[in-house]
């Protein structure tokens, strides 16, 4: 996929529907490891009782960390447009008997959440969504002052290892949808100062922005 092209939502969901049952087995091919997910959830700085939204929750790979962070008094709202991916997430919720996880099949760009949010997570989804800025805007409107948006994703932009990592990124985009040249920090800067940390030789990053007490 090119640096500016995004696949339409229907095409993206079709791809994920096809691989949903095998997604966990495919994660090593994408160099996705539990420490990356834990790092993203930790960056949300959630407290027990918090309400958190995950945009592009997929099969629910982040749910154990999110549920642990908010505790039994908190709530996790997990959104994805793929029926197949959410079906796998529902199996996980059933096995773990989580009563505080709500799964929603929605287009994130049109999402309307009816609760105030203490955190919003885009984990490996911001570079895939056809309209990520719209999804961010809708989520931001429901965030409490002091709440955080965290974007964890893969990308080649602004990394000194860009030339070395380019073949890996091209392979990843062949295996699944996504724009390795996505710049989520440009969208996030509309809302405040952005903190960015890179890891795994700069291939992955975590971006954080905090909603000010004024609510701006």
Language model features with spans:
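A short glycine-rich, Lys/Arg-flanked "PGG" loop and its adjoining helix->strand segment in the class I
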Residues: 133-145
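Conserved class I S-adenosyl-L-methionine
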Residues: 2-45, 61-65, 88, 164-171, ...
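A short SAM/SAH-binding and catalytic strip from SAM-dependent methyltransferases
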Residues: 119-132
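Class I SAM-dependent methyltransferase SAM/SAH-binding core
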Residues: 53-55, 59-110
